[in-house]
Amino acid sequence: MRDFKTYLSAAPVLSTLWLGALAGLLIEINRFFPDALTFPFF
């Protein structure tokens, strides 16, 4: 189990999880608020 925790704390695994979560968040924001680039102009 200790080796598995070491693997999960490796930089490629953490960056993959972080980028996947960020991409999912951006997709959901764009699904609920499409064309968000027009918001600052109102």
UniProtKB/Swiss-Prot annotation:
GO biological process: photosynthesis
Alphabetic keyword roster: Membrane, Photosynthesis, Photosystem I, Plastid, Transmembrane, Transmembrane helix
Domain of life: Eukaryota
Membrane topology term: Single-pass membrane protein
Regions crossing the membrane: 7-27
PANTHER family (UniProt xref): PHOTOSYSTEM I REACTION CENTER SUBUNIT IX, PTHR36082
Function description: May help in the organization of the PsaE and PsaF subunits.
Family per similarity comment: Belongs to the PsaJ family.
Protein name, UniProt field: Photosystem I reaction center subunit IX
Native organism: Cuscuta exaltata (Tall dodder)
Gene name of the encoded protein: psaJ
